[in-house]
Amino acid sequence: MALLLAASPANAGPAGCEGGAYQAFDFWLGRWEVRTADGTLAGHNEIIREHAGCLLVEHWQSATGGAGSSLNFYNPVDDRWRQVWVSPGSNIDIGGGLRDGSMVLEGFITYLEAAERYPFRGTWTPLDDGRVRQFFEESRESGVWKPWFDGFYSRSESRPESRAGAAGAAPD
């Protein structure tokens, strides 16, 4: 009886999130130095894959001391990627998917102290030279989008594919 239970599909481990849409944002994985268009250091970012490839976790440290993190995941039910960002000053909740080779996510930014919320969108574009451009916009006036952040990611160290719990990952 115990042998039958151990082999049943209900007791099998999770299949993980591999292939296709689950890997559409993999170009963002890695350790990065982030600079603005004029070359000013904006900060450092690390994006890792966790939980059998089902989650991308971002850890941001700005050059001025600010920090934040995001959880990024693909939902196959609505065929959309979602990012939930949390920092001491703001929360961002955006969703979408690949559009012409770029990851485009749209939703809202909430400024915590002011308790204000505005439409927000982010576009991540892999560039031919191996960098990634991250361009954020916000709309405080109906239909008028203004740049919020424009950063260029350059790899700073080896690319971490995953941590423990990811498909094929070795324990830490």
What are these model-predicted stretches?
Residues 8-10:
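Intrinsic disorder/low-complexity segments in short proteins, especially the signal peptide
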Residues 1-6:
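Bacterial N-terminal signal peptides
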